[in-house]
Amino acid sequence: MKNTFGSALALTIFGESHGRAIGGVLDGMAAGVPVDEEFIAACMDKRRARGDGLSTPRVEADKVQLLSGVVNGHTTGTAIALMIENQNTRSGDYAKTADLLRPGHADYTAYAKYHGFQDARGGGHFSGRITAALVAGGAVVLGALDRAGINIVTHIGRCAGVADTPFALDDPAALGAQAEALLSRGDGFALLNGEAEEPMKAAIRAAGSAGDSVGGTLETAILGLPAGVGEPYFDSMESELAHMAFSVPAVKGIEFGTGFGFADLKGSEANDAFRMQGGRIVTATNHNAGLNGGISNGMP
C-alpha cells in the first residue's frame, strides 16, 4: 500500500478515520522557508465541518501539531511531520454495518485487497477524514507558493443543480479580482456569486434531511505560475495535477480549460493565439488552461 505522492517534494500520509491520529510527513522542503501556523490553522478551519448540515456531521478540532522539521517558524530542511488527533470517534455507530457493503464506498474493494485485515471503522484509511492530512501538508506548501507570487484558488462551480459564476479564464485581470474575492472569504463555502449561496445551501440541507446527499464540481485556478514549468508526456502538469486530484475520495472526473467542451469546437476555435501584452507573451484565449505540451505557458 503506497501512501506517498511526489518525488522532489513528497507527502506521505498515515492514519485511519477512527484511529488515534492522522497526519503526514512532508519531505523535500528547503531550509529556511517560513511556516505560518496561523495560516495552516486557517486552511484547516476552511475544511472543518461545522455541524450546519452542509457537510459531514462529524466535527473535529483539526489542530495540526508540527512534530519535526520546523523550528522558530522556519523549516529546518529535514522532514516535516504533521499530526492531527482524532477526537470525535464513535466506532459503535458502525457496528451494525460492519458486515454490510455500503454502495459507493471502499468496503468491498478494501476487503478484497486486504483480506479482512483492514480497519473498517468509519471507512478506515479510505475515509474523507484523511483529507485533513492533505490539507495540512498542502497548507505548508501553499504558504511558500504564496510568498513566491503563486496563488491557488478554488470555488464551487456547481452543486445540487445550482451554478456559480465561472472563472474569467480569458481575462487575467478579472480572474485576479475573482481570486482576491475568494481569498478574502473566511469560510469554506467558496462562491463568486453571493446570490447562489442560499439556494445551494438549501438544496444541500434538503437532501440531507431526506437521508440523501448531492454531487458537485469545483473550479480551480493557479495564478502567477511562470512559463516553462512541467514535463512532456508522463510527468506533464496535467498528469501530476490529476494524480493528486484523484487522491481525494469521490473525485470521478477532471478537465483542464475547455476540457470535454473541445468535442464541440473546431481547431480554429480551440487554438489559443499568442500575442504580446505588457512586454510578455500571453494568449488571446485560454482554452488550454495555460498548458501546452504538459508545460505551463504563463497563463492561469
Summary of predicted features, one role per range:
Residues 43-109:
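Glycine-rich, N-terminal phosphate-binding loop and its surrounding beta-alpha-beta segment
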Residues 17-18, 30-31, 46, 86-88, ...:
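Acidic, glycine-rich active-site loops and adjacent beta-strand->loop/helix elements
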Residues 13-20, 135, 210-300:
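Glycine-rich anion/phosphate-binding loop at the beta-strand->alpha-helix junction
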Residues 113-233:
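Glycine-rich, mobile lid/loop segments that gate access to catalytic sites or pores
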Residues 1-58:
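N-terminal, positively charged regions that mediate nucleic acid binding
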Residues 1, 102-117, 214, 268-278:
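Acidic-glycine-rich active-site phosphate/pyrophosphate-binding loop
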Residues 44-52, 84, 88-90, 112, ...:
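Structural signal for hydrophobic packing residues in well-ordered secondary-structure cores
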Residues 50-69, 163-190, 194, 208, ...:
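A structural-propensity feature for long, helix-poor, extended segments
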